[in-house]
């Protein structure tokens, strides 16, 4: 892994196409002035960035474009005319422990970390998650109204968030002004639960409590927006199936969630004229029949739900949901947390799952811990992975392998991109490096260039020919590599 972030060769082709093209047939294109470049037609070009265990974010040359039929067994056929779902974006979760780690650094290093995640030159994250009250990487237990029996939410307050989470979000917005944020609670206020505690337990189902909780959400959206945060969506509960962990949780059944959404939350938002998307999430992916069908199958609730958030191994749930509820937005809201190993193998797994989930109609992807300290541990003792690790004692920044898993997507695939058809030849099946839905995906950005993402999980280099229409080019993917190729003018 790298302990300092390399300065990447600019390969993003949007906004200033010619001035930012890194390679044309493996050679560097020079321009005397931006205005001179803008007058020239865009020449067909390829920009390629690759990451391996020993060399992350390396610019590599592709072979010259050719109009001859491709040769060799490993042909990737791109069909930009066959399109699938739009892509809303990528990001991670804003957590209190992360901001605490960032603030241990001096101003220039703080800026480096935030730029690496949110600036156009970095991961370019535009779609992020935040907890409503304490999550498992908060500094301590808390909610936004801990006054028992305060059904009118008289004592509702986001003052704690104004000191920690909101400054974190606003610092990110300096580098990503269009940052969109969605909120989800791990636990309601403890007095609303059957066990009167943040961990474990279930939501009380009496009408006064449910009505108060709906008001809690409405006040939250309004307060965050007044504080300058673009909170575009809310989800009712993080992992409603779980109630046995040593961190904030709350159990709901699918039927209970539907009742809360239909009879309390949606009417309260309408009454308060709060125009915010309501999603069903965040659901552990294997629980589609138990949680998704009761809500989306309801004639009143279903049409008012903007999307679904799935966590962990989402591919079967994404595909099944798309087939049953076509056109519904879906977001991968969290992947495996692991235990702080931050290994290349885990990064390859995350990269593969991103390809898989997006190939099965997910519209976006949010990672869990963007930043942690060298302890990598929650307030309740759970050590986990992160994209960036900050050594708070030695003031050292480490960009972990999964940082590059995310960046290979988020730096190049822009909001509004569309997934396009990308297929490997059938004779690849069964080889050491098959192009399955876990190893190949492609998009067309709003500015027109094609973005092809390839994974070579094998231990040997893999020659590949990219073909789109009459154009083709050869690349050799390094062993154990993650790759992004940007094709302009094809």
Model feature map: region roles:
Residues 133, 184-186, 236-239, 282-283:
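Short, well-ordered beta-to-alpha junction loops that form the rim of enzyme active sites
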Residues 137-141, 189-196, 240-245, 288-290, ...:
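Short acidic/His/Gly/Ser-rich catalytic and metal-binding motifs that mark active-site loops
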Residues 4-23:
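Bacterial N-terminal signal peptides that target proteins for export
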Residues 194-206, 239-253:
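Active-site-proximal beta-alpha loop/turn segments in soluble metabolic enzymes
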Residues 1, 18, 30-43:
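Bacterial Sec-dependent N-terminal signal peptides
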Residues 94, 132, 238, 311-312, ...:
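Residues that line or immediately flank small-molecule/substrate-binding pockets and catalytic motifs
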């Amino acid at each position: 892994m790298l302990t300092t972030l390399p300065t990447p060769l600019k390969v993003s082709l949007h906004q200033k196409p010619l001035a930012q093209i890194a390679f044309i047939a493996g050679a560097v294109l020079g321009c005397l002035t931006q205005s001179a470049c803008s007058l020239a037609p865009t020449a067909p070009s390829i920009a390629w960035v690759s990451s391996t265990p020993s060399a992350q974010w390396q610019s590599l040359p592709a072979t010259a474009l050719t109009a001859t039929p491709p040769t060799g067994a490993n042909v990737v056929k791109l069909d930009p005319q066959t399109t699938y779902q739009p892509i809303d974006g990528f990001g991670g979760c804003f957590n209190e422990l992360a901001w605490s780690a960032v603030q241990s650094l001096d101003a220039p290093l703080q800026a480096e970390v935030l730029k690496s995640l949110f600036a156009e030159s970095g991961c370019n994250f535009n779609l992020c998650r935040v907890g409503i009250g304490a999550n498992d990487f908060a500094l301590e237990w808390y909610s936004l109204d801990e006054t028992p029996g305060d059904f009118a939410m008289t004592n509702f307050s986001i003052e704690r968030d104004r000191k920690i989470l909101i400054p974190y979000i606003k610092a990110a917005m300096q580098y990503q002004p269009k940052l969109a944020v969605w909120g989800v609670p791990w636990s309601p206020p403890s007095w609303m639960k059957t066990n009167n505690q943040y961990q474990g337990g279930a939501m009380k189902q009496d009408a006064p409590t449910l009505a108060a909780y709906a008001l809690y959400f409405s006040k939250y959206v309004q307060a965050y927006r007044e504080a300058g945060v673009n909170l575009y969506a809310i989800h009712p509960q993080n992992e409603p199936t779980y109630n046995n962990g040593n961190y904030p949780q709350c159990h709901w059944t699918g039927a209970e969630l539907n009742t809360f959404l239909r009879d309390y939350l949606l009417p309260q938002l309408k009454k308060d004229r709060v125009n915010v998307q309501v999603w069903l999430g965040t659901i552990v992916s294997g629980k589609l029949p138990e949680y998704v069908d009761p809500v989306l199958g309801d004639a009143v609730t279903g049409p008012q739900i903007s999307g679904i958030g799935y966590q962990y191994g989402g591919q079967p749930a994404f595909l099944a949901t798309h087939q049953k509820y076509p056109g519904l937005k879906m977001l991968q809201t969290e992947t495996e947390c692991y235990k702080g190993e931050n290994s290349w193998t885990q990064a390859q797994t995350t990269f593969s799952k991103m390809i898989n989930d997006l190939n099965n109609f997910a519209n976006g992807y949010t990672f869990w811990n963007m930043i942690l300290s060298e302890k990598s541990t929650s307030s309740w003792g759970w050590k986990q992975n992160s994209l960036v690790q900050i050594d708070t004692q030695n003031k050292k920044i480490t960009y972990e392998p999964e940082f590059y898993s995310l960046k290979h997507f988020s730096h190049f695939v822009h909001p509004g991109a569309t997934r396009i058809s990308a297929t490997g030849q059938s004779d690849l099946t069964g080889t050491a490096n098959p192009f399955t839905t876990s190893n190949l995906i492609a998009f067309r950005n709003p500015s027109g260039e094609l973005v092809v993402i390839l994974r070579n999980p094998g231990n040997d280099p893999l020659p590949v020919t990219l073909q789109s229409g009459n154009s083709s080019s050869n690349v050799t993917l390094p062993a154990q590599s993650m790759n992004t190729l940007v094709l302009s003018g094809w």
